[in-house]
Structure formats: structure tokens, C-alpha cells
Amino acid sequence: MANTRVIELFDEFTDLIRDFIVRHEITTPEYETIMQYMISVGEAGEWPLWLDAFFETTVDSVSYGKGNWTSSAIQGPFFKEGAPLLTGKPATLPMRADEPGDRMRFTGSVRDTSGTPITGAVIDVWHSTNDGNYSFFSPALPDQYLLRGRVVPAEDGSIEFHSIRPVPYEIPKAGPTGQLMNSYLGRHSWRPAHIHIRITADGYRPLITQLYFEGDPYLDSDSCSAVKSELVLPVNKIDIDGETWQLVDFNFILQHN
């Protein structure tokens, strides 16, 4: 049976593309170049990356809107289901014994729009290594849940986890996505350092967001255009057992279904 929503979207999409071709007088050689480029994106397995880089921010803004809840942000292509549930107090994201990077302590809370703690929430946390790679998505890293974990709030809604502070990194630039950005559009392919967050709780809309750090050189030129000012966090330094740690704090607010 035909899907009326698909028909509506497909017809308008193809009409827009045809109008674009006419308005810009796209020639047959240009059309063939575009077609070959699209084929190369598929052959490189970069369609998730390409779509995230150019369109996911817009989809995110349409899907979640703004209100008195925490702003959403793109999920990106590096999420992995099944991260371990961290039961330590405080929780510590899995890492190698000699994991390089500045130690980071994250504190915060999960509440609803009236300020009530959401104790049944599950917070998926993941971020890059100190050299900008993600476990399961880099041949340089073992296929295990490195710098990935799930955290649950305490009875008062508070959360705390320890990790390393992520760093800015370039999205893959050797493939067609990076080549388009760098060689043809004249843009860089850097993303500011960020922590990925996905929070689920019964009765609430899932929250997918990213948290950034004040002073990052790529906040104003993120290659994915995903930065929102309300998601940029100040960073303080504290001493824990004689070692300097980076301290960040953020309170999440979820919206009811």
C-alpha cells in the first residue's frame, strides 16, 4: 500500500531538485560529476557522516524545538548501543590503564521542567579519545566500550562521572565528505571538543545532546554547525588526591511526552 507521507515528501523533493537543475542550468557533465560523487559517498560508507555534517542540525531543530528543557543537538554517527551500566560511586567511563588526556569530573542532575528529580533516567555518555577517535569506529582502538557508559541518577537526581576531557577533532577528511568540505567548499572539517549525551526515561521525551567547553577554538566554526551557546560549559580546575582535574557541571531538564 502506498504511503501518503512518502509520496508527499518524494514528490516535493524531486520537484525541488528539478527546479534547482533548471535555475542553475546544470549541464550533463555536471550532472554526471554529481552522480559519481554521490556514488563515491556510498562506496566509502560515508552517507551517515555526510548527512550528519550537512543536514542533521536542521532536522534536530525541527524535531525538538525550544522550551524550558535542555536543548537537543545532533547524535552524530558514532553512537554504539549496549554500553555498560556504570555502578561505581562515582561512575568512571571505561578506559585504558594509561589513557592519555586531562582528567575530567562531570557533575550535574536530571530533572523535569518542574524541578522534580527523574531517578529512573538512564544517561548514555560517549566521547572521543585524546587523539579524536571513537571506540568501535577506529582501527587504532580495540572494539570495546572505551569512553562509553551508562549512568543513572541518585535519588535526588544528581549524577557524577569521571573520564578524560575530549579534544577537538577533524571528521574523516580523506573520503568524499572531507574532500567536499576542504577542497571544494573551502571549509575546515574540525569539530569542537564535546561530550555526547542521550537520556531516556519513562514518560519523557528522549534527549540527545552534546556539551561543549568554553574557550574551544572551533565553537564558532563547527564543521557540523551543531554548537548551541546554552550547551557550552565553563571549565574549572580542582585538586583530587593531589592531581589536577577538569571540572564541568550541567543540569539536564527533560520534557514530558
UniProtKB/Swiss-Prot annotation:
Fe cation binds at Y134, Y169, H194, H196. It catalyses: 4-chlorocatechol + O2 = 3-chloro-cis,cis-muconate + 2 H(+); 3,5-dichlorocatechol + O2 = (2E,4E)-2,4-dichloromuconate + 2 H(+). Its cofactor is Fe(3+). GO terms for molecular function: catechol 1,2-dioxygenase activity; ferric iron binding. GO terms for biological process: catabolic process; catechol-containing compound metabolic process. Binds 1 Fe(3+) ion per subunit. Keywords: Aromatic hydrocarbons catabolism, Dioxygenase, Iron, Metal-binding, Oxidoreductase. Pfam families: Dioxygenase_C, Dioxygenase_N. Its EC number is 1.13.11.-. Belongs to the intradiol ring-cleavage dioxygenase family. This is Chlorocatechol 1,2-dioxygenase. It comes from Rhodococcus opacus. The lineage of its organism: Bacteria, Bacillati, Actinomycetota, Actinomycetes, Mycobacteriales. The gene is clcA.
